[in-house]
């Protein structure tokens, strides 16, 4: 089964001694600890098909190739924001045999001849922005990863309670597994409501 994969990353608060001290004694920015949760979502099933927890200093582009290796299914498109517009990310997508739907950064230059990214850069230079390219190639589906991250935070609390990093990784995978079970039971159906009378 081929699927489209969308990527996102967002912070999870680690609730431990540092948070308790902030609550008890007032704000002190040094004590707060965050972890970044990087996820990949299948746009047809809304299932989180890959996840990785990293330190707050790690960028999404550094984690992306490992996250892509976790997926065992055939993928035809990979969407992500401009942070994934790196050579390593595009190389990982090409190895997987997928098309990259990653907007180039503003003022991006062309890469080597016949690179798939050059089409996107050409659209940006021709139209002055990425708007036309985003509409043409369905970049809006990337919002499904934002929705999945929202579900993680709303349904499962969006914070980690364990202090050990390895235990936090296990806690995160348990959260993702639970969320995928809930998603498998069914997603709410949404429809647009016209408020005009």
Label each PLM-derived region with a short phrase:
Residues 8, 66, 118, 130, ...:
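Detector for Asparagine
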Residues 25, 61, 122-124, 185:
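Intrinsically disordered and other compositionally biased segments
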Residues 44, 87, 117-120, 168, ...:
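Intrinsic disorder/low-complexity detector
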